[in-house]
Amino acid sequence: MNYDHILIRFGEISTKGKNRKSFIERLKQNIRLVLKDYPNLKYFSNRDRMTITLNGEDPEALFPHLKQVFGIQSFSLAIKCDSRLDDIKATALKAIKDQYKPGDTFKVATKRAYKQFELDTNQMNAEIGGHILRNTEGLTVDVRNPDIPLRIEIREEATFLTIRDEKGAGGLPVGSAGKAMLMLSGGFDSPVAGFYAMKRGLSVEAVHFFSPPYTSERAKQKVMDLAKCLSRFGGSMTLHIVPFTKTQELIQKQIPENYTMTATRRLMLQIADRIREKRNGLAIITGESLGQVASQTLESMYAINAVTSTPILRPLIAMDKTEIIEKSREIGTYETSIQPFEDCCTIFTPPSPKTRPKKEKIEHFESFVDFEPYIQEAVDNIETMTLYSEQEANDKFAELF
């Protein structure tokens, strides 16, 4: 059967009222970006659907890309025919015969966007179902759990028939909800937090704190690899590498040992906030999960948050470690996160960090130290790079020759 289109169904975009048009346009841009290596494709979108005309491109090659685009509820290979009853019946029968084997069940589900069509939805289901039953053997109807779900979408300009649905990533198109900075370490949590933030439509830029010689170049490469993993869901990932050695050394010298972790997090948050402001972001994302470690108690979060009024988003706040690790496997960051290269937070962890720090105490300790020059020096010497998934990176390298 010659499937010549892909039909894309939107998720939450359909509920966005007056903003629907901008959401759909953003989704179209994101789809074009991940499918940019397929120049023959043509795109058409309406209120709650998008259609891609293949023009000879291999549809199976497109599926892995489409599954990673947030904002897509599901998508299907589709056959296009004229919106005439006889044409629809003939196309439906041909599609079923191409798929079924004796003993299979099927269901017809019609969506009639073209209200002037001669039959209503129920009449159409009965007409097409009866036509298929009369012209096949060993095929029966099952409206609850069919082996072959035949969907028919009747529009004025054409009708589309689909048989197999592929599940999309759901959520909202990346970039439709604004920009935020992700505090990206080398562990399991922050990449998963970044994934969930992108799923809610945020354009994410990553911030990593690097403290050589205490942390190695391999630890830095690990974070770059994690950013590449996340870039699959947004087309690319901007990563800001913050030189943090001098600041951490000062903290170790000037702040009481059991409060060094709290001070470190507060300084990190202030630097991330400066980057956010320069990059026109509106929030900061962390991988914190309530009570998971000493710095993630409610008292710690309160003391750390006090340095900024910027919204701090914590997508993992109610998840446990097992759930987070399972999600990291699902999104492809697990194998990188498990590599044994420590980041600056683990290198300088005190033996007995304060689990319930007092905001007044850490402010008192910090009042004896002028951190501002160190913050500004770190911001002035940030290394910024744009990273792509391995396939996109290979394509860009090939373009140089």
Curated annotation (Swiss-Prot):
Gene Ontology molecular function terms on file: ATP binding; CCA tRNA nucleotidyltransferase activity; tRNA binding; tRNA-uracil-4 sulfurtransferase activity
SUPFAM superfamilies xrefs: Adenine nucleotide alpha hydrolases-like, THUMP domain-like
Example GO biological process: thiamine biosynthetic process
Pathway: Cofactor biosynthesis; thiamine diphosphate biosynthesis
Keyword Transferase carried by entry: yes
Superkingdom in the source lineage: Bacteria
Broad class of the protein's primary localization: cytoplasm
Pfam families, A to Z: ThiI, ThiI_fer, THUMP
Family: Belongs to the ThiI family.
NCBIfam families for the chain: tRNA uracil 4-sulfurtransferase ThiI
Protein name: Probable tRNA sulfurtransferase
